[in-house]
From Swiss-Prot:
Residues 25-65 are annotated as: Disordered. It comes from Hypocrea virens (strain Gv29-8 / FGSC 10586). This is Glutamine--tRNA ligase protein virJ. Glutamine--tRNA ligase; part of the gene cluster that mediates the biosynthesis of virensols and trichoxide, fungal natural products that contain or are derived from a salicylaldehyde core. VirJ does not seem to play any role in virensols and trichoxide biosynthesis. A motif ('KMSKS' region) lies at residues 351-355.
Amino acid sequence: MADAVAEAVAKLVLDDETGEMVTKNELKKRIQKRARKAAAAANRSNAQQEKGNKPAANKPAAKPEERVIDPDAMFKQGFLGDVFKLRPEESVVTRFPPEPNGYLHLGHAKAIAVNFGFAKYHGGRTQQQLDGQINYIPTDVADSRFDDTNPDAEKGEYFVAIEDTIRWLGFTPSEITYASDNYQRMYDLAEELIKMEKAYVCHCDDVETKKQRGGEDGLFPRYRCEHAKQDVETNLKKFRGMRDGEYAPRSAWLRMKQDIENNPNPQMWDLAAYRIPKDQEPHFRTGTKWRIYPTYDFAHCLCDSFEGITHSLCTTEFIMSRESYEWLNKLLVEFQPMQREYGRLNLSGTIMSKRGLRTLIENNVVRGWDDPRLYTIKGIRRRGIPPGALLSFIYELGVTTSITQVSIKRFEQSIRVYLEKTVPRLMLVLDPVPVVIEDGEEQDLDIPFSPKDPKLGSHTIRLTKTVYIDRSDFREVDSKDYFRLAPGKTVGLLNVPYPIKAVSFTKDETTGAIKEIKAVYDKEGKKPKTYIQWVPEGSLPAEVRIHEALFKSDSPGSAPGGLLSDVNPNSETIWPNALIETGFHEVKRRAPWPEAEGEKTGEFHPETVRFQAMRVAYFALDSDSTDEKIVLNRIVPLKEDSGKSS
């Protein structure tokens, strides 16, 4: 009997509007009823409008067909397909060159996917470049380069975090390089540039430099400073003096002699090539060996050439930089990489700038860089979003030259679709209230982890005489449009052979809250319209954190009262006394869910313990958990939250 009922319960579906688990027939009836109500409302509205100006009657939204995302599609066609046609190399080499001055965010995940994916698809490699650069490969295709040219802002922890992020996403570096690997070579080329009379040492301050570039708004004539008239020997002497510590920070800098007077492109207005850092912090790798450091505009293009990067793929804010990139490479190096630019990924309703994130952290709005409400990669991971779900979202969006502005709702919907078929299901009660089944008998129930995928296996749960349901699933007074538990009303318990009927309840004399419900099995009644989740006695206590949008508006960075004025004071709700069934132990033991190459590290990572709490949401174990305490973060809700900004 129990097996038959369990099989029937496995076929229940979620009513998105009420959050109830119901039969397919019942859901069909509800949808039809809502459609009739919507049509009637539309007809009443239409009757009040002028003839010929009637809007179409509202119809229930059709359930979208499940899309199968081809991860290679964005490399075969569109922008990236065209990029390859421009330079169809047999051996493609790309790079991912972050500056190690902070933690990566969602936009960086797109850059990783683009560069590693492009090289992998074309059988090449990707390098990772850091302050230097690092060359990486997605499973041996890309280079990762660290652009480590600013020791004042760079820290060793950022290098480690960036490498960890790349591997978490499932990509393996073919090579890791650093801009600092090439410091001497770049210095020598800077001297060559001086000898070619294409660079000079300048002593102008910021105010004077701005005047040379046309003033604050660029409305005045541009001109080159007097230092550009210095001869080669003078410039070489000064540049070597910069190297040897003869100048104070910001008192001298090497400028490229480009075309400041005639070229309308600001990236050709005699950009800086070398500067003396203000704080003179020791470099992460080279210590105090160097007192001067190349700028991004000088180092980036040269390192691309040194490393044989065939396709230098970056975001559209570097479109104008392409001219200076090519100008410098043509002067100094033989191998010429090709730079092309694609649109950034922006998420509305949040911020990803380092300055904004620091403001939130310093004002204790969030717990740190890994707060689940942030869209840093650390925050996304702690929240429980799997690497595969993140990549699937990026592949779904594709790549164009336009900036991609995406709502939080769309992001969460993509994650929800990914999780639906890849994580097990458990029962969780946020606000438990006991139900004593007076005629109940204890028995073991075999519950599948997924009603749709038997490969996920099953677990045993003990049906006890006292069970706990969510307080929101009981009403003291019944109504016709209410289908959960109420006095004299019947409701199904997920995977339990018989529905229960509430016969009485008691209340706390002080608070007025429901203290206990008494019920009996309704063995002869009709099949219930609704099933609710429950947990037995002996279930595991848990703290559950439900996170909403961190900001009230879609553009928190532009809020009239500043960033902090736009913070949503209700962005986190904590349920301290939740209960989860003991099947959680098995889910934890078998993590990661789903299996992912980047999460098979041999170490336990709590956020890989992911599951769907039936009728509640998707959850992951938080890093605040201990052996004695379970802490859960909501990954995404089961249905779209209408109150969430889009």
